[in-house]
Amino acid sequence: MAVRRIATFDDWVDLFRVWQKDIGVAYPEIVDYKFEAKFGPTRSNEIEFGAFKGRPKWEKVIQIPDQRIRDAMQNLIVYQGDTEFASVEQQRRLFQNAPSEHDRQSLCRVVTEEMRHGWQMCHLLINHFGYSGRVEAQKMLERRAFDQKRLLGAFNQDVDHWLDFFTYTDFVDRDGKFQLTMLSYSGFAPVAQSMIPMLREESFHLGTGQDGIKRIVRAGVVPLTIIQKFINKWVPVSYDLFGVDRSSSAHWFYVWGLKGRYDEPQAKEEADLERMNEHSRFLFHLECEKLIEQINKHIPAGQTPLYVPDLKFHRYIGEFAGQPYSVKGELLSPREYEEHLREALPQPEDIKLVTEIQATEPNWIAAKGSVQ
């Protein structure tokens, strides 16, 4: 990668093309995609919550009344953009072994739209945040998930195969839907307007994941116990992505009108500023339970249904970080917990088995359109 600092968005686009080639995703259908910034109408032209509620949304950074608020807004954009590019890097090796041409095209669309979302965030940084925005936009293309350099740990983990991919897009991308929704209420108009097209595109990613898991369950070749292990891998990671408990950052994001609650339009009560992240995480957990209920409809009678891991299981962030809770929420001894993790999470032999099944069993996943 070039080390010279970019001066314009066109400079950044040149680096973006180098990044595509460098990570190995410069396929024709991706390179030929028309990358562009997209904006949509927001629910309101006024700030909808926090200390500035009722005032016009800020159209330019200079209108934001405090440098701390400007810095916080930039930071939110940086973290969102970093996840978008990271997810492409995580999924870059899946093109060679897609189960069908339909799935390859779905993967192409998912990674292309993730790239566009990163492009959108960098467009905001470069066009609204001056020198610091340009620096951060360039750094997004210099970090690598496979070098463990992305800002959030979830986006430095490998996505090894298509079961990994489907569980990732169903749950980790669903956290993304929550984050984009909360930012769609932002008092900084360019961010709020950016989220509308991004959410439309993100819905395809979620559907790809949910449909993929259903198709794997319907085929009945991959053992349900292994499918459960990959749910256990990615759901707790998604819990952590909501951030620490009693977060002062989430508190001030709300007070400053930068990031609302997921259910902001429907919420009747005042926001609990001390538990903003916990509120979103709980709503995410409820949504995951409904998803698993839908998947379980495709499991034959008499077989053990899938389930959502408890909010306390395998956490690295928040009140339960590092504590020995089981997938069912039971407190274990440290020794019991170590053994439980070996049983509950994917092990090398599980990854090997899934890889072998996907390479040798042509019917390991049901055809597209075979499930509802």
State the predicted function of each range:
Residues 1-105, 127-160, 242-372:
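Terminal targeting/low-complexity segments that flank the catalytic cores of oxidoreductases
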Residues 94-98, 183-184, 213-216:
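Secondary-structure edge/capping motif, primarily at the C-terminal ends of alpha-helices
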Residues 77, 107, 166, 195, ...:
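Hydrophobic packing residues in well-ordered alpha-helices of helical domains and bundles
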Residues 106-127, 197-215, 233-240:
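Alpha-helical scaffold segments in carbohydrate-active enzymes
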Residues 3-6, 71-80, 99-117, 165, ...:
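Alpha-helical scaffold segments that form or flank carboxylate-/histidine-based iron centers
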Residues 208-228:
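Catalytic cores of carbohydrate-active enzymes
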